[in-house]
Curated annotation (Swiss-Prot):
This is Glycine--tRNA ligase beta subunit. GO terms for cellular component: cytosol. Keywords: Aminoacyl-tRNA synthetase, ATP-binding, Cytoplasm, Ligase, Nucleotide-binding, Protein biosynthesis. The keyword Nucleotide-binding applies. It catalyses: tRNA(Gly) + glycine + ATP = glycyl-tRNA(Gly) + AMP + diphosphate. GO terms for biological process: arginyl-tRNA aminoacylation; glycyl-tRNA aminoacylation. It comes from Nitratidesulfovibrio vulgaris (strain DSM 19637 / Miyazaki F).
Amino acid sequence: MSQFVLEIGFEELPSRFLPGLERELAERFARALDDDGVEHESIRVLTTPRRAAVLIEGINPVQREAEEVVPGPPVRVAFDAEGKPTKAAEGFARTQGVDMADIFTLSTDKGEYIAVRKRTGGANAADLIATACPTVVAALPFPKRMRWGSGDFTFGRPLRWLLALFDDAVVPFEVGGVVSGGVTWGHRIHGAGPLVVKSADDYLNVVIEKGGVTPDPAERRAMILAGGNAAAEAAGGRILWKESLLDEVQGLAEHPVPLLGDIDPSFLELPREVLLTSMESHQKSFGVEGPDGALLPHFLTVLNLTPLDVALVKKGWERVLRARLEDGRFFWKTDLAASFDAWLAELDNVIFLGPLGSMGDKTRRLEKLCAWLAKAAGVADESACARAGRLSKADLVSEMVGEFDTLQGIMGGIYARRMGEPETVAAALAEQYLPAGPDSPVPATLAGALLSIADKADTMAGCFGLGMIPTGAADPYALRRCALGIARIVLEHGLRIDVRELFRTALALYGERAWKLAPAEALVKLEEFFMARLKNHFMAAGHETLLVEAALAADTPEGAGIDVRAAGARLAALSDFSRRDDFGSAVLTFKRAANIIRKQGQEGGAVLDGAYSHALLAEDAEKALAARLEEVAPRFDALWAADDFASLFGLLGELRPAVDAFFDGVMVMCDDAAVRTNRLNLLKALTLRLGRLADFGALQM
């Protein structure tokens, strides 16, 4: 078996480009080899800031062979009455490059045709790979592409070299004016090169040993972790590893060397969040904490070389970080000399979103919406929630958030504590932007949860009123994330909030605006959008699609609104019910009842309200069903009020035998109109309760 290596050398790519580049190279080469019939055992992709290497092992040097039957014209056209080949047959043979002796008759459902067997494959795998390489490289996608020189070729960064070897032979091709060869380049300082690679098998040894490069991202990550942990342990602490930053720094170095530096202990007076953000965002460095969880006066950075003078390099990093921390201290002291009142006044000069007014307007709306939410959720301290809404965006005009925008909300909470606001308010301000994504936690405090809901609902209502509704992948105001965040917060906090009324109130608080959508229309679209996100959330949690659709389509009582908590509990109970052995037969029974009522309402024109007359109940089975319904009804209503959906589905099990007996022994659509309507109303009384739990008609069994 053979080996192949392709190394694409380029100027430093941003670290965030590398994971996608690895994935695309692996997928595109796998697809190209499969399409060409080149058998192989494995494909491995390694990336650094300056190179991407594709290593393919276990290659069959010869393309997979196969036999193909190529049909030609019908036999009646291919031969004349005397059985001699016609021009059609001769032309077919000539086109296929065979003699007439190679032609045979192929019988098909459509008749007999002449045909020829042709063997395909058997080509040199190296030649096929040489053809695939320029196509794959040129088509690689990047978040941003650039052009250099006088050509039109674009790539993530300028190409500098191409190494391509099939075993010990160069695979010749050209991309963007760069011709492939058998030469690579190492680390700029520890093994620049040029370095000759004699074979694909020798590639890693040359790059690592002679080039001073660690090409494997996982190995670089492990080196950073091991070196950083050892250095911190020697200083009596531990590194505060941030996964996203760790991923970034391993993609910034070909030769990673962790270095522990020191900071002036006086900077520890700054808030922990300020120190860490300054280290991480500006210097790509990690903080260090002691056994008690307090920050230590150290930081860890990652170099891209082994320094000759460690002390000198360390001193340089400390000097640069000190300047950053001095800026942070200045922002901190300046902000502490300000006040929330001053910041709130400044918010009136900060635009929220076009026609939707200023950030000051938004905070006044949030003050009222938080108070409404607190009352709806039964929170005792409505005033604290309202105060949190009013102060929620004040830190946006602070010096610190102006420099570190990722600290929005967090600094609001810190400043609230320093300026004497209640802890409830401070915690809410710090948590208002949670959850930041599908894997981010929701606010831990109830006040924070309500402020986050209010903020998201206000943004959604304003955008929908302006017709800014997400389409396709475009969602510039992250409205999908807002909707998902509201759903998660309500579910995880178990809040009983009518989301329809939430959006209605949020729209109303804007007052008179130059809306593109009337409030009533915007409300309908908001509901549809929110329910679609809720459905996606439940499916992502592992619930079956049909069960989710059935639970969300339940016919809740008029005026019930959108109760997300109840929907989640209803779906969980339905999912449990679906695991019962008799689930399928139960669904068929209840679905039959639902379908009869739906059909009579849509096609028969019957107006059914569930009120039936005992005097018209003639059959034993219908009397038994009526009695069972009346016995179960008070229990159903009590369980419904308690949101005990598991027990409600248990009641369905109790009802089912009576329903089955009804269908077995009673002719619903009888000739007597009065009796027929009475029986339909009996079924309507059943489905009025069934429909609250799920749309059984939507379930396919």
